[in-house]
Amino acid sequence: AATLVLAVAAALVRPTARAGFVAGGPLELAVDGLSAAVVVTVAAVGLLVLVFATGGIRAERPRFFGLMLLFTAAVMVTATATTLTVLLLAWEVMGAASYALIAFRWREDAPVSAGTTAFLTTRAGDLGLYLAAGAALAAPVAGTGAGDRLALDALAGLDGPWLHLAAAGVLLAAFGKAAQLPFSFWLSRAMLGPSPVSALLHSAAMVAMGGYLLLRLRPLLESAGWASGAAAWGGALTALALGAVALAQRDLKQLLAASTAAQLGFVVLAAGAGSVAGGTAHLVAHAAVKSLLFLAAGVWLAALGTEDLGALRGAARRDRATGLPFAVGALALAGVPPLSLWATKDEILAAVESPALYGVVLAASALSALYAGKALGLLLASGPPGTAVREPGEETAEPLRTAPLTLLAAGAAVLGALALPPLAGELKRAVGAPGEPSAGAATLAATAILALAATATAAALAPRLPEPAWARAWLHLETAAHTLAVRPALATARALARFDDTVLDRAVTGTAAGVRRLASWASAADRSGVDRAVRGVADGARYLGELARRPQTGQLHQYYAQALVLLTAATVLLLLLR
């Protein structure tokens, strides 16, 4: 609660905090119009998810809540970072915390494998931020220090190929975190984490930060030219393809996971098309909708022990305390007016100029209504109750369950006002985009009719809607990633290991053996040559000493005789020399 109060205060005051870090690269956080909306959203959704988890998480509570708070803090720092230095620090902590939360049940193999897949997949995209930082530092900019070059606002001013490298790196990092094509499959695996983790991860936290990064760096995309189109088309195609994936799912959490990637596709599209305000409104509204839906799914998973839509048939009708908020969230996800995602999608659609892109976005919007209608139709249908297999540690006390769901349902119902007059104009001014287009009455009416018709059709035909295997398998994206990236990487690693063993290790081992032999030879030479010479000198000195000692008898008459001999010899020598 204190974090939410501080977030609201920061949104009103718009503070800036700065501290020294490394030479030329200070740590700086700032709240502006865009980050204010995101910070308040993260704090509000995080608070409600944690309240829900208070009644639902029984095992290892200190570790769970500590990781959730760390995760939320990293998201808040990501949203307020003004330099690549701070952004990278928060980005890394956010990724590490997500791994720990997805793999929270670390004694089980499946969650650990899921956390590893999510972590490594997003890490592959994270390399793009390092590419962007390298481009910013390498670019020739006169009169600026490293800190100025690494400022997010300065990236749009890079010249030549450095600008395009930075844009490519940012797109790669954002697509990885936002689960856009081709990275989307990691969201499917992330469903093995606890339900509150899924609710926060998919709504206001890590996945949302991918879209937020592109909204923040819209000037960079615009300066690079091609990057705007790449973001727009990448987001639109993800919304379309993952919408088809969501429609084919038989598992509620898998349907919601695919819809997360699809809905973030609209945010990425907004960044590319130049609808920063529309993307922000959609990001905020989607956070309320998706956290609500995941928490409700967690309630039914705990109560019935299943996520299968067939087994959950009629669950929302029987459990009205959960079913009514879920229905509000599902209708909002479908884009049914006047609920939140109806107007926010149209605000984004208003910025799309390409007819082909417009058609793709309309089709993706229709798919949103279809997959939301499918889930709603099955969960509201009459039928036998699911098998009661309650999972210990996942039950949620009634007040701690209903209060967050009710508040999130209220947000899912009203947050679309951010994309409607007069709040739409205020939001555009707050994010510094007063000239962005708005959806007209005709567009709003047409999309409303489309959403209502598609939702009603899907709800009526829910059990008979097509579920192609390629879509149910998430487009086989994980298989493709293993084929195109993982297996070649492992094969390369094995080849390098063999090269290391057969060439490098052999060279090192051979060198060591040669050095040992040389040392052995040197030791033998030392023993046979140097040691013998030293001993010879010592023996000679000892022999000479013995010779010199013989005349030393201690007898005086012998000394006289020796002196007489020496004197005689010296006299003879002198006579001979003359």
Question: Where are these predicted regions, by residue range?
Answer:
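Alpha-helical transmembrane segments and their helix-start/interface "positive-inside/aromatic belt" motifs
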Residues: 1-2, 116-126, 317-325, 395-409, ...
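Membrane-interfacial helical/loop segments at transmembrane boundaries in membrane proteins
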Residues: 17-24, 148-156, 347-351, 422-439
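Short aromatic-rich membrane-water interface segments that cap or initiate transmembrane helices
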Residues: 23-37, 156-167, 350-359, 434-441
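Membrane-entry segments of alpha-helical transmembrane domains in multi-pass membrane proteins
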Residues: 28-41, 77-90, 227, 281-284, ...
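Hydrophobic transmembrane alpha-helices and their helix-loop junctions in integral membrane proteins
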Residues: 48-87, 96-388, 392-393, 417
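Juxtamembrane "helix exit" motif at the C-terminal ends of alpha-helical transmembrane segments
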Residues: 338-340, 417-426, 567-578
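Hard-cation-handling environments
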Residues: 394-454
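Aromatic-capped, Gly/Pro-kinked transmembrane alpha-helices
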Residues: 431-437, 465-578
